[in-house]
C-alpha cells in the first residue's frame, strides 16, 4: 500500500474491536502495576487525574466515556465525530495504532504494538492509583 493509499484507508467501525495483531484484550492477564510503568510514556501528554487536561485530555474515567466528550477540551473533529465509546476492548484496539482507529486524531503517539502493554495500561486506567 502506498502512503497516499494508507492515509485514505477508512477507520474500522466504531463498534469494531479488531486489532492488527489479531489479539484480544481477553487473551491477556493484565498487570496494572506494569501498566502504570507503561503509562509513564502517556504522561507526556495525558494525566490520570480527574479534570487535569494537558496536551491531551485527562484519562481519568476514560473507560465508558464517549470519545471527544470532556467539556472544554479541544478535540479533533475526527475524535468528536468518531461515534466511539471507550470500552476496554476499544481502547485495546485504539492503543495499538491510534491513527488507524481515528484517522485525523490529534494524538501523534504511534501506539503500543505489544498487546500485553496495552492490556496493562488499560488495567491501570481502570483504577489509577
Q: What is the meaning of each model-derived region?
A:
Residues 87-129:
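C-terminal capping alpha-helices of c-type cytochrome domains
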Residues 32-36, 47-88, 106-109:
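Gly/Gly-Pro-rich "capping" loops immediately C-terminal to redox-active cysteine motifs
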Residues 1-8:
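Short, low-complexity, disordered segments immediately C-terminal to signal peptides
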Amino acid at each position: 500500500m502506498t502512503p497516499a493509499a494508507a492515509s485514505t484507508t477508512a477507520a474500522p467501525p466504531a463498534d469494531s474491536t479488531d486489532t492488527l495483531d489479531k489479539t484480544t484484550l481477553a487473551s491477556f492477564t493484565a498487570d496494572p502495576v506494569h501498566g502504570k510503568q507503561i503509562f509513564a510514556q502517556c504522561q507526556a501528554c495525558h494525566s490520570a487525574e480527574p479534570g487535569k487536561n494537558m496536551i491531551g485530555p485527562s484519562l481519568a474515567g476514560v473507560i465508558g466515556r464517549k470519545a471527544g466528550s470532556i467539556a472544554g477540551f479541544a478535540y479533533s473533529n475526527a475524535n468528536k465525530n468518531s461515534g466511539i465509546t471507550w470500552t476496554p476492548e476499544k481502547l485495546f484496539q485504539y492503543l495499538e495504532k491510534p491513527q488507524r482507529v481515528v484517522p485525523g486524531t490529534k494524538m501523534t503517539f504511534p501506539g503500543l504494538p505489544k498487546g500485553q502493554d496495552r492490556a496493562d495500561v488499560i488495567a491501570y486506567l481502570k483504577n489509577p492509583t
